[in-house]
């Protein structure tokens, strides 16, 4: 990885660790959403205007099939936020690991008034670290992840850790833990 990017990541982690709690200057994230047709929408993040996201539903649910569904973006955001924190912290601490893949699963009720029961993130890592080091990294990554912190207040969040192809730990947080 380019050394300038590594330094940006390290500075971000260090700066974030120094923010007092509660944050005296919380950020506001804005996304402008434009209806296109039926259930198709275009979203533009205010702080990243160079990107456009298309959100839709499959045809069998009345959409035009021009983009992932809202729930897919939701789950993707949950998983990648946590993944970013694992990688940022591993880079910052020079932990000798790499991520080979991640699988996110959401268990939810499709009833009116239903909601998520559990969100499971399976993280597959390769490297020469101890289980204790991996657990420490996971604790830090979860604490740095805004989405994980928010979701664990209302739903069971499970992180399954795999190291060098072997399941080594299950971590859970949430209202039922």
Model-flagged regions — what are they?
Residues 1-73, 88-177:
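Extended beta-strand/beta-hairpin segments
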Residues 75-83:
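Compact, glycine-rich, soluble single-domain proteins
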